[in-house]
Amino acid sequence: RVLVYASGKNRGGLSQSIIDHWETAIYEDDLWRLFLGTQQPPADWHGISFDENTWTSAPGGFGYGDDDDNTLVPDTTTSFYYRRIFTVTDPTKLDSAILSMDYDDGFIAYLNGVEIARSSNMPDGAVDYLTDTQTDHEAQMDVGGNPDGFHTSKAKMASLLVVGQYVLAIEVHNVVPPSSDLSGRTWLHFGINSSDVFYGPNPPFFGNVTTTAYHTNFKIGFGETVTLYGADGSLIDSI
């Protein structure tokens, strides 16, 4: 199954890397640093040099309303921010990355301050702690589903990774409050191009993650017809 967003954002899919195996570097229930969005966080909150010691240390995931959160936040929360530091010892062996996100309603993810994923219901450009999502999005794992997967290409990985410490930082936003639920559950997986082992085993759901990395370079308006053709030009379906 391939999920394609007609978003106009023109984002490609998985690179043709040769991956020996996958490992998980960050888990949902690891200890993270958490900041509630009652005010704007410092501008460098998603960078590795930020002093996170004033933020709360708590196990993920975070949220309220779905009975699937290890750390509860107030049910009046519009947004919250969380981050976790990890180490890369040999970036040449990390060919690909997938961020697994189970979220309600929207999020933006950063690696050392560089954006690597954004849910399709978040506005483009800069956002602040009061930004609402454009539509709602329900978390899936509490009803037996799987998180969404967001792929980071080999080319982008090469531009980001050197030996040293990294921080994965996430901001989660609610749809127009009051909302019945809010959730952020996060895993970070790496595709390893050798038999070397750097991190931990993958969670059970990982083999079923849908990588939501495909976005068209056009948008579809209300009432327009969508037509699917095969590689030979034959009509497959239309709606």
PLM feature segments, named:
Residues 1-21, 135-186, 190-239:
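Solvent-exposed beta-edge/loop recognition patches
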Residues 2-3, 49, 54-56, 71-72, ...:
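Ser/Thr- (and often Asn-) enriched beta-sheet segments in non-cytosolic proteins
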Residues 6-11, 35-42, 61-63, 90-92, ...:
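Acidic glycine-/aspartate-rich tracts in secreted/extracellular proteins
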Residues 18-94, 125-152:
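Extended carbohydrate-recognition surfaces in non-catalytic/accessory domains of CAZymes
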Residues 32, 55, 86, 92-113, ...:
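Aromatic-lined ligand-binding clefts that engage carbohydrates, nucleic acids, or primary amines
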Residues 51, 90, 102-105, 181, ...:
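Acidic side chains
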Residues 78, 101, 210:
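Short, glycine/acidic-rich beta->alpha junctions
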Residues 78-82, 95-97, 105, 164-166, ...:
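Residues at beta-strand starts and edge strands
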